Regions:
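Acidic, Ser/Pro/Thr-rich low-complexity regulatory regions
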Residues: 2-170
Length: 170
């Protein structure tokens, strides 16, 4: 009889754990889709202010000009040949991608409301796709698998966000 009680206890513990997991999933979803607060707005504005510098404007202009002319290198080797580490262009690439890294980090840990961020900045699909090969090359070359991982996470979350937030204007 004692054995049977132990088994029953294990089963009920497993059921509770399963219920707890389901509840945690609901809580996480509720947190992710919460209505933005004034604190969320302030964090978004602070992030915008942080990247509102001359070098950030230069970095964005450089990235978009190279992208539109199809001059943005698509491999790490081509990137290094054209823009060696320490060059102004390498710094601009670093700065351009760093703002997405920081936003991804803040969203990942729940400090920045993703609805608010993606509603303001969009999907980042182009930014990630055009930067991805260089970033992956840097990860490998520097033996740093975490280099710009939050930018990558941001892009993945943005794609998922777009699926659930269709365009409201035509």
């Amino acid at each position: 009889m004692a054995r049977r009680q132990k088994t029953v206890s294990k089963v009920s513990l497993t059921k509770n754990t399963s219920k707890q997991r389901k509840n945690m999933g609901r809580v996480r979803k509720a947190i992710k889709t919460k209505t933005p607060t004034i604190d969320d707005v302030n964090i978004l504005l602070r992030l915008a202010e942080l990247y509102n510098t001359t070098i950030d404007f230069e970095a964005a202009e450089w990235f978009w000009a190279k992208m539109h002319k199809d001059e943005l290198p698509s491999s790490i080797q081509e990137f290094k040949d054209k823009y060696p580490q320490g060059s102004r262009e390498f710094q601009l690439f670093e700065r351009f991608t760093s703002k997405f890294e920081l936003a991804g980090l803040l969203i990942k840990y729940g400090f920045l409301n993703e609805d608010l961020y993606f509603n303001r900045f969009g999907s980042l699909r182009t930014e990630w796709e055009r930067s991805k090969d260089v970033i992956m090359g840097i990860r490998k070359e520097w033996d740093d698998p975490h280099f710009r991982e939050n930018f990558e996470l941001l892009s993945i979350r943005a794609s998922k966000w777009l699926e659930t937030h269709p365009q409201t204007t035509k």
